Amino acid sequence: MQKFLSLIIVILILYNIVKLKIYPEDNNNSTTIEQITSNNSSTNAHQASINNEPTISLNGNLFERTVSKIVINALKTEEGKVFFENILQPLNGPINPNDYTIEVHKDLVKTLFKINTFGSGNIGPASCGHVVTVFYQISDMNNNLISEDTKTFTLGSAPVMLGLDNVIIGMMVGESREAIIPAKYTVNNSNNTIFDDAYNYKVTVILKSILPQNFVKSNKVKIYDDEIAYRVPLLCGEKVSFNAKITRLSNGKILFDSKSTGQPIDMKIGDITYPLIFSYALQGKVQVGTRSVIAESKTFKALGSNLNKVIPHESLPIHEYLLLELNDFKQIK
């Protein structure tokens, strides 16, 4: 269904471009359309005020109007918005000349949790696996305060609710965020306040500190996907099985390849015994295709002590960029 809908959208876009190129409107038609639009605008505005929502006029033949209605209705749902965030990302030059890739610009997690960020900071950003200290407030959708506290915890451990961990990711120290946590992400690993998983919740959070101060800077990382899909992305704190391959860009030497050993990685996103870049790349990934990541070698270090389950720290080249390829995703319950 997703592929069919994507095909329809592409065909419609191409059809309208060709139609505009071959049959340009003349001035008289343009004037007539402007007059009709002007005459109808007041009527539409009045109707919109009655219905309490803007009137959407659908033009074109029956097929075009039907597809437009499908798209409009899809965009009214959270999963529909996430799907179109996935589709509407610009194509970039391919890493593999025999294939194409899509450069990841949008953060689907921000869309999922309706995140708004306020203030600024110069320490960060927080990634899944970092130890953070935050002040948070959780309210119901009627703004009745349910819980507030200052707490220190590891992102991915979900001591309060899984959604809160994911709202904090990407924050700088000193910033604050407001978000809405969907009911399915209110689960936690604590014996404290248990939230009803039948309701959504409002969250306000202020980031006070991050440890250790080993960060993945978005302007020094390139992430590409070779496939998109109508699915909810992976989140910090969830468990996933996948294959990983690490290649040295300077000479093409393969430093690690789980597929060649026949042993895929089973990992909780945020596990500090795996390279930091793994959690960074997995959080927000839709479980299809291959995600290719170009990042500095220092981001391939684990946040934990000197333990790195993938590649020993002493084997990592210094001041180089490495290519990480992740695929064969399977979420673990």
Swiss-Prot record:
Q: Which GO terms describe its molecular function?
A: peptidyl-prolyl cis-trans isomerase activity
Biological processes per GO annotation: protein folding
Catalytic reaction list: [protein]-peptidylproline (omega=180) = [protein]-peptidylproline (omega=0)
Enzyme kind, highest EC tier: isomerase
Which top-level group of life is the source organism from? Answer: Bacteria
Keywords annotated in UniProt: Isomerase, Rotamase
Pfam families of this UniProt entry? Answer: FKBP_C (PF00254)
Q: What is its EC number?
A: 5.2.1.8
User: Start and end of every PPIase FKBP-type domain?
Assistant: 129-227
Q: What is this protein called?
A: Putative peptidyl-prolyl cis-trans isomerase RT0383
The species this protein was found in: Rickettsia typhi (strain ATCC VR-144 / Wilmington)
